[in-house]
């Protein structure tokens, strides 16, 4: 348990004790203590509505109850400096700030582990994200999904969940046939031969590259092969090429995966029929008009869904159900899918399938990634000026840098449309949030270097934390102390942007402290050491938070 949790628990215990001591209720009758952090810090560090909760039990006005609680409260036991009553009976608590200095040694000793919580309790969570078709470059929606998905995985891991990151390779559908046909066209063109591009063909530069590579490596060998042999080879070659490109792009984006799961393996390993049989045994499959259907309306879907068409071919839904059954068979406690905005309508049928398999709908969570719009010079940008094509993830990283791309994509709720300001992302000003945060980290590192040059360094044995007493220092410590709670909240609510908000608050408090206080005082070694220790605690916390969203913490800028 971290110090912030210890303080809150002590405060809750003392509130309950005060309620009982004041004769307002028996301990068994006291409701759960709700503590909130007031938005306005002049209203204290914590606030509770316990008086309103007790009104019916104590048969008194909430304000009178609040006064009784305040009189019976032992401030010393809960590190409380003072209390006051606001409005109809809210009780505000102002902490004795000296308790905050206990955070400094705790953070310095925890180092990279600071912020870890046991919120997840080892729960096995699988997060499937990106899962773009291996038929071309990753676009902006994929990039946002990759950044959000990886950040969420990092946060879940920090919060004590057992996380598995998975990429589902769509390699069994018609898109792979189209990929092979498109490669064939470019291969023939590279040899100076004509071939018509199919209507659904892929026209990207990367497909031209595959065709040229094949021509260079094999000459006209495949011109003389049978169509069947040629397509088989081009499917495998094109898929391998595109997958490797995806892997490299994602690794360069600091997005690793534990599992790359092939859709084709569902067929090869006989996973489809058992999934269908399970649904049939549970009574949710029926035949109509020559097709096989899932009775998804039993679970709130707006209509029943076809699983097998009249011609005997599978719809997308059946292998998807088999895939999700396989996930559940692997023993995951929770499945999280991160999908693009175009998949929104697919959620009810997939949730229905999960329930038809015998699991609660909540076993599958789906986070939707909304669209991204780029702006440059105040105008919406649709195409890359360099290529004349749609902007890819690689283009964006080249334009604004890896850190800015990761930070900006993690900065807003994934459920909202995003306007990505390219000019802001590359500006070296405090208006740019990633620059502001990284500059705070570099500024701390500079202070630590200056201290070292003068013979001072963070030292818990030499530091006298009674020197930590300014409002700016306490503001920093309160934010540092809140980091584990932020991690827990971001994990539980699946909101990585909560961490970027926190990073901004911590950076802002650091800059404010830097502009108001002097860290190195050559006439007072214990004070200097205490403040350098505070700076080290801030640096550790900021670096840990940045790491969660895949952003580097530079020591110099």
Curated annotation (Swiss-Prot):
GO CC annotation, single: cytoplasm
Pfam families the UniProt entry points to: Arg_tRNA_synt_N, DALR_1, tRNA-synt_1d
Class of enzymatic activity (EC top level): ligase
EC number: 6.1.1.19
Reaction equations catalysed: tRNA(Arg) + L-arginine + ATP = L-arginyl-tRNA(Arg) + AMP + diphosphate
InterPro entries: aa-tRNA-synth_I_CS, Arg-tRNA-ligase, Arg-tRNA-synth_N, Arg-tRNA-synth_N_sf, ArgRS_core, DALR_anticod-bd, Rossmann-like_a/b/a_fold, tRNAsynth_Ia_anticodon-bd
Chief place of localization: cytoplasm
BP-aspect Gene Ontology terms: arginyl-tRNA aminoacylation
Location in or out of the cell: Cytoplasm
GO molecular function, one term: ATP binding
Alphabetized PROSITE patterns for the sequence: AA_TRNA_LIGASE_I
Record keywords: Aminoacyl-tRNA synthetase, ATP-binding, Cytoplasm, Ligase, Nucleotide-binding, Protein biosynthesis
Motif 'HIGH' region positions after renumbering to this chain: 132-142
Family statement: Belongs to the class-I aminoacyl-tRNA synthetase family.
Subunit details: Monomer.
Protein name per Swiss-Prot or TrEMBL: Arginine--tRNA ligase
Organism name: Bacillus pumilus (strain SAFR-032)
Organism lineage: Bacteria, Bacillati, Bacillota, Bacilli, Bacillales
Underlying gene: argS
């Amino acid at each position: 348990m971290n110090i912030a949790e210890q303080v809150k628990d002590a405060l809750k215990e003392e509130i309950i004790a005060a309620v009982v001591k004041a004769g307002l209720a028996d301990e068994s009758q006291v409701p759960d203590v709700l503590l909130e952090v007031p938005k306005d810090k002049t209203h204290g560090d914590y606030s509770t509505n316990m008086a309103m909760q007790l009104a019916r039990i104590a048969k008194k006005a909430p304000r009178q109850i609040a006064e009784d609680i305040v009189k019976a409260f032992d401030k010393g036991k809960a590190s409380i400096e003072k209390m006051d009553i606001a409005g109809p009976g809210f009780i505000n608590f102002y902490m004795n700030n000296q308790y905050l200095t206990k955070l400094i040694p705790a953070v310095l000793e925890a180092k990279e582990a600071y912020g870890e919580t046991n919120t997840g309790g080892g729960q096995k969570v699988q997060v499937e994200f990106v899962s773009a078709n291996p038929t071309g470059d990753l676009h902006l929606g994929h990039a946002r999904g990759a950044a959000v998905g990886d950040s969420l995985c990092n946060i879940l891991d920090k919060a004590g969940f057992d996380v598995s990151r998975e990429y589902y390779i769509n390699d069994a559908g018609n898109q792979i046939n189209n990929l092979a046909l498109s490669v064939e066209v470019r291969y023939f063109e590279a040899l100076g031969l004509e071939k018509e591009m199919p209507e659904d063909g892929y026209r990207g530069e990367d497909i031209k590259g595959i065709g040229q590579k094949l021509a260079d490596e094999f000459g006209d060998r495949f011109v003389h092969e049978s169509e069947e042999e040629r397509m088989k080879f081009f499917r495998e070659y094109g898929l391998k090429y595109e997958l490797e490109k995806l892997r490299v792009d994602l690794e360069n984006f600091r997005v690793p995966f534990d599992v790359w799961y092939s859709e084709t393996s569902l067929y090869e390993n006989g996973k489809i029929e058992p999934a269908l049989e399970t649904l049939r045994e549970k009574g949710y499959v029926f035949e109509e008009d020559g097709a096989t259907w899932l009775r998804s309306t039993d679970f709130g879907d707006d209509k029943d869904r076809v699983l097998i068409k009249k011609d005997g071919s599978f719809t997308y839904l059946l292998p998807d159900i088999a895939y999700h059954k396989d996930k559940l068979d692997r023993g995951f406690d929770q499945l999280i899918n991160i999908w693009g905005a175009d998949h929104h309508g697919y959620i009810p049928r997939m949730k229905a399938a999960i329930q038809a398999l015998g699991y609660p709908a909540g076993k599958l969570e789906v986070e939707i990634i909304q669209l991204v719009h780029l702006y440059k010079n105040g105008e919406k940008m649709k195409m890359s000026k360099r290529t004349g094509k749609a902007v890819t993830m690689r283009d964006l990283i080249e334009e604004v840098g890896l850190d800015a791309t990761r930070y900006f994509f993690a900065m807003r709720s994934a459920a909202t449309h995003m306007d990505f300001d390219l000019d802001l992302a590359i500006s070296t000003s405090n208006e740019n949030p990633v620059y502001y945060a990284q500059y705070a980290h570099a500024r701390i590192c500079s202070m630590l270097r200056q201290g070292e040059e003068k013979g001072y360094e963070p030292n818990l044995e030499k530091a006298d934390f009674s020197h930590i007493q300014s409002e700016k220092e306490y503001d920093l410590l309160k934010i540092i102390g809140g980091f584990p709670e932020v991690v827990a909240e971001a994990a539980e609510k699946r909101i990585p942007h909560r961490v970027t908000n926190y990073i901004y608050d911590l950076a802002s408090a650091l800059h404010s402290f830097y502009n108001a206080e002097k860290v190195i005082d050559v006439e007072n070694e214990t004070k200097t050491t205490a403040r350098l220790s505070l700076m080290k605690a801030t640096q550790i916390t900021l670096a840990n938070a940045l790491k969660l969203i895949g952003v580097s913490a530079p020591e110099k800028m």
